[in-house]
């Protein structure tokens, strides 16, 4: 299924920008993703990029959490970037927002590559499939399964926030994010 999704994204990208990207104005559309299927007491799941899954029991204890390659490697990646790009001495984010050459270099170096600090994005590139993480979890004791994007990462580190979200109280992350919940009966 993920191969099909990834190839459909490539067809979309080719129809809009052609066969070549400049990693800037003609950059490929890409996305992070997560999903899964429950059969019996087993959840088969996957994630790529900063889309994640959190599995909780009825007391809101974390049973399982997917690996967020973007966040996990971000500090190491920043150190590596500072070594390789000497003119960066301040925030990487500042350069991302204001330095086109840096954005081009970063995308070529760190998205869907063999670089040990790279992360995946479903953008049609075959390499994206190598960055997908797969999981098999026993979920007999699971009650809540949350699928979310990076905007909710910090929110979901706090148990009180998790309880508020599950009980459908109003809660807004500091940055944009998507949250989908499932209650297992």
Placement of each model-derived feature along the sequence:
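PP2C/PPM-type serine/threonine phosphatase catalytic domain
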Residues: 1-185
């Amino acid at each position: 299924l993920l191969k099909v999704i990834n190839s459909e994204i490539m067809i979309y990208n080719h129809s809009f920008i052609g066969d070549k990207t400049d990693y800037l104005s003609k950059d490929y559309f890409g996305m992070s993703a997560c999903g899964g299927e429950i059969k019996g007491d087993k959840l088969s799941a996957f994630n790529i990029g900063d889309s994640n899954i959190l599995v909780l029991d009825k007391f809101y204890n974390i049973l399982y959490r997917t690996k967020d390659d973007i966040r996990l490697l971000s500090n190491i990646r920043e150190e590596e970037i500072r070594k390789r790009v000497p003119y960066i001495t301040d925030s990487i984010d500042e350069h991302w927002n204001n330095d086109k050459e840096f954005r081009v270099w970063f995308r070529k170096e760190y998205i869907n590559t063999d670089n040990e600090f790279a992360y995946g994005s479903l953008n049609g590139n075959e390499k994206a499939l190598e960055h997908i993480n797969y999981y098999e979890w026993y979920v007999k004791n699971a009650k809540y399964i949350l699928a979310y994007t990076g905007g909710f990462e910090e929110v979901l580190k706090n148990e009180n926030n998790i309880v508020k979200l599950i009980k459908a109280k109003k809660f807004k992350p500091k940055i944009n994010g998507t949250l989908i919940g499932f209650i297992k009966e």
